[in-house]
């Protein structure tokens, strides 16, 4: 039974035998052509190499710049604020202690994802309109620091 099992047709591709005479179709130069860089051993050309000519990616002009004065804010959503007890004061120091944010970056921005049902005092650098409305609607306070 086991000795009769064969793989599905064309499932196992036979390897191309190189340099085995002119009758094989890949004799003599083994499909590498005559001389030149690509015929040598260890032929590895990096992607985009154009034979010494200035490559396309270097010919096109550079665009844009990196703004070093850009401010990045740590994001805090209402779903996270919902986990705090009622009437608690949420500050960047508290968020760092509880490991809710790893790095305050340029400050903290509170976003409006989720719902808030608890009255809280939130101190942060920025608030989205939706987050601000949600905190105030429940009777909480907002302080921009």
UniProtKB/Swiss-Prot annotation:
SUPFAM superfamilies: Ribosomal proteins L15p and L18e. The keyword GTP-binding does not apply. Residues 20-30 have a biased composition (Gly residues). It comes from the Bacteria. InterPro entries: Ribosomal_uL15, Ribosomal_uL15/eL18, Ribosomal_uL15/eL18_sf, Ribosomal_uL15_bac-type, Ribosomal_uL15_CS. GO terms for biological process: translation. Binds to the 23S rRNA. Part of the 50S ribosomal subunit. NCBIfam families: rplO_bact. This is Large ribosomal subunit protein uL15. It comes from Phytoplasma australiense.
